[in-house]
């Protein structure tokens, strides 16, 4: 059986933490930033974890993570 391929787009977007969760960036910090408050932009800069409902999908996309 051949090796499973990693989805390269997902590999660039998600990182596995030591506890086995997946880290991701928050959306909304690329453009149209003038109407967003400094507090909101600061919070958007922090990383978030992948929700439990989506962990299975991420694991399938990253078989070797």
Curated annotation (Swiss-Prot):
Recorded GO MF terms: structural constituent of ribosome
GO annotation, cellular component aspect: cytosolic large ribosomal subunit
Region (Disordered): 1-49
Basic residues biased stretches: 1-43
Domain of life: Bacteria
Keyword check for Ribosomal protein: yes
GO biological process annotation, one example: translation
PANTHER family according to UniProt: 54S RIBOSOMAL PROTEIN BL35M (PTHR33343), LARGE RIBOSOMAL SUBUNIT PROTEIN BL35M (PTHR33343:SF1)
Protein family membership: Belongs to the bacterial ribosomal protein bL35 family.
Protein name: Large ribosomal subunit protein bL35
Encoding gene per record: rpmI
């Amino acid at each position: 059986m051949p090796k499973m391929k990693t989805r390269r787009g997902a590999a660039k977007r998600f990182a596995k933490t030591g506890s086995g969760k997946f880290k991701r960036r928050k959306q909304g910090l690329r453009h149209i930033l003038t109407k967003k408050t400094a507090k909101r932009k600061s919070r958007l800069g922090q990383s978030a974890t992948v929700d439990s409902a989506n962990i299975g999908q991420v694991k399938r996309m990253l078989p070797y993570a």
